[in-house]
Amino acid sequence: MMEFFPEIPKIQFEGKESTNPLAFKFYDPNEVIDGKPLKDHLKFSVAFWHTFVNEGRDPFGDPTAERPWNRFSDPMDKAFARVDALFEFCEKLNIEYFCFHDRDIAPEGKTLRETNKILDKVVERIKERMKDSNVKLLWGTANLFSHPRYMHGAATTCSADVFAYAAAQVKKALEITKELGGEGYVFWGGREGYETLLNTDLGLELENLARFLRMAVEYAKKIGFTGQFLIEPKPKEPTKHQYDFDVATAYAFLKNHGLDEYFKFNIEANHATLAGHTFQHELRMARILGKLGSIDANQGDLLLGWDTDQFPTNIYDTTLAMYEVIKAGGFTKGGLNFDAKVRRASYKVEDLFIGHIAGMDTFALGFKIAYKLAKDGVFDKFIEEKYRSFKEGIGKEIVEGKTDFEKLEEYIIDKEDIELPSGKQEYLESLLNSYIVKTIAELR
């Protein structure tokens, strides 16, 4: 079989002192932490679309990427080559999972029937490669945003025919996700929203979106798909206002339509940025709701107003992200999918590897720091003390629902002074710094 990356060796762990760009400094997949290998804590995944389809095109310029599969001019030959390259890529990086959109892995035909037949051929190739590999599918999804038919949306379109097409496309995507043993299925509504309310039936669109998701739940039950359904919130881009704006908005929608028991969230760092939140905020919201399912690992540029999908290299972000994952009990049917692309000027094949290595190292280091923070309980202890007034006396009565406005007025009306604890933000931020420095110093 053709080798796509002959110049790239299998990536090894060399430790924090290594200067080799094609080696792990902090990620040792077999390092055991809390009784489990690091690779099973992190569950890294390759995003097929950014790694094997993206070619460095932007609105102002042509593709720049040098990719070995581009030697194939026939669309099917290229599709098969990308699949083969995926498995070689994952095996050299010791990544055990991948994610895809249906249209990433196979080209479209003239009709949906023809497209499905093409898709089946590529799925067979993936299944063949899986037989001799430990690479698995983390989650699948359907591309309901690229084709012009979805200009008004998919589930929220003004066309019943387009709604039907989208439903049939998701039906097929669910089938192949199940066939490939996917742990989950993601819904991202890039076109589910509006540009202006002047031409939008907001009520109908939201109701149709709920109808669409309910149909998906029912079909998954029918075919025996037991993977986790995931909503991926994003406030805007490509649509001006998207209905799954953030975790809180999407959860309210699911709750309102009785769908909350079937869905968790796939949280993307850059989407949190676009919503005006920190990555940790979205993860914390999902965690306290019991809905933290999976993560799209990347980072954005705070100076830019769009989804830059950069590889994650910010240790603060990865530490606080993994802190939330640890506090949630870790991943079950989810993981860390690198929804990230190399920069347009990072056009060499080796840059694909370097980008993933950087992200894997940064999350591995973040996990190790977060594990110490969680184990020592430093933030938990401070928070518990800060809110101690609700553990006793009148505060305990408030929490237990044993008081009311009249009783609270009677309690407080003659009190002259209320003593408040200090928030000590500066101390806690410096404590986080100390844990980062200490953890790195202790690593081999």
Curated annotation (Swiss-Prot):
Q: Which GO terms describe its molecular function?
A: magnesium ion binding; xylose isomerase activity
User: Could you tell me what reaction this enzyme catalyses?
Assistant: alpha-D-xylose = alpha-D-xylulofuranose
Q: What is its main location?
A: cytoplasm
Q: Name one GO cellular component term.
A: cytoplasm
Could you say which EC number(s) this protein's record lists? Answer: 5.3.1.5
Q: Which amino acid positions bind Mg(2+) 2, per UniProt?
A: E268, H271, D307, D309
Tell me the InterPro entries matching this sequence.
Xyl_isomerase-like_sf, Xyl_isomerase-like_TIM-brl, Xylose_isom_bac, Xylose_isomerase
Q: Give the UniProt subcellular location, in the record's own words.
A: Cytoplasm
**Co-factor remark:** Binds 2 magnesium ions per subunit.
Q: By its UniProt entry, which Gene3D superfamilies does this protein fall under?
A: Divalent-metal-dependent TIM barrel enzymes
**Is the keyword S-adenosyl-L-methionine assigned to this protein?**
no
BP GO terms, sorted:
D-xylose metabolic process
Which enzyme class, named as a word? isomerase
Question: A Pfam family in this protein?
Answer: AP_endonuc_2
List cofactor names only. Mg(2+)
The record's listing under HAMAP family reads: Xylose_isom_A
Q: Which NCBIfam families match?
A: PRK05474.1 (NF003998), xylose_isom_A (TIGR02630)
* Quaternary structure note: Homotetramer.
What is this protein called in UniProt? Xylose isomerase
Q: Which organism is it from?
A: Thermotoga sp. (strain RQ2)
Gene name tied to this protein: xylA
